[in-house]
C-alpha cells in the first residue's frame, strides 16, 4: 500500500519529494512531514517561542479546543503547530486534514505572529 504522504502529494498534484518531505506554502508557511507506520505528522513552526509565560499559557490552552496541537520545537526557540493523521486515512481525509492544518496555521500567524 502506498504511504499516506505519497497519497497526499498525489491529491495535491505534486511529485513526492526525493529528500526531506517539506512543502512551502505561498506566504512562507513551511510544513515538514514525519511518517511512521501508523501516522503522518505535519509540523509547522509559526513564531518564536514567547518570553512571556502568560502568552505561552494562552497557546497551550488552544490545545483543548483544536485538532491542531501547539508545542515547542526541539531547541525551544519556536512554537510549532502539529497535526497527525492515521495511515488508514483516505486521500480525501488527508487532503481535508492538510487544508484544516494550513488554515489553522494561517490564523495563528495572522493573529499572533
Swiss-Prot record:
Expression induction or repression: Transcriptionally regulated by InvF and SicA. Also regulated by SirA.
Subcellular location: Cytoplasm
Keywords assigned: Chaperone, Cytoplasm, Virulence
Highest rank taxon of the organism: Bacteria
Pfam families: Chaperone_III
The keyword Chaperone is assigned to this record: yes
GO cellular component term of the entry, any: cytoplasm
SUPFAM superfamilies linked: Type III secretory system chaperone-like (SSF69635)
Database matches in Gene3D superfamilies: 3.30.1460.10
Family: Belongs to the IpgE/SigE chaperone family.
Subunit structure: Homodimer or higher-order oligomers.
Function according to Swiss-Prot or TrEMBL: Molecular chaperone required for SopB/SigD stabilization and secretion.
Protein name, UniProt field: Chaperone protein SigE
Species this chain originates from: Salmonella typhimurium (strain LT2 / SGSC1412 / ATCC 700720)
Phylogenetic placement of the source organism: Bacteria, Pseudomonadati, Pseudomonadota, Gammaproteobacteria, Enterobacterales
Amino acid at each position: 500500500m502506498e504511504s499516506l504522504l505519497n497519497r497526499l502529494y498525489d491529491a495535491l498534484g505534486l511529485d513526492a519529494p526525493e529528500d526531506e518531505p517539506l512543502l512551502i506554502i505561498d506566504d512562507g508557511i513551511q510544513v515538514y512531514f514525519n511518517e511512521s507506520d501508523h501516522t503522518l505528522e505535519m509540523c509547522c513552526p509559526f513564531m518564536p517561542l514567547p518570553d512571556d509565560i502568560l502568552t505561552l499559557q494562552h497557546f497551550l490552552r488552544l490545545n483543548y479546543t483544536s485538532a491542531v496541537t501547539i508545542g515547542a520545537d526541539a531547541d525551544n526557540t519556536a512554537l510549532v503547530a502539529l497535526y497527525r493523521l492515521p495511515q488508514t486515512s483516505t486521500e480525501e481525509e488527508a487532503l481535508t486534514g492538510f487544508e484544516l492544518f494550513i488554515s489553522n496555521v494561517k490564523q495563528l500567524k495572522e493573529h499572533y505572529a
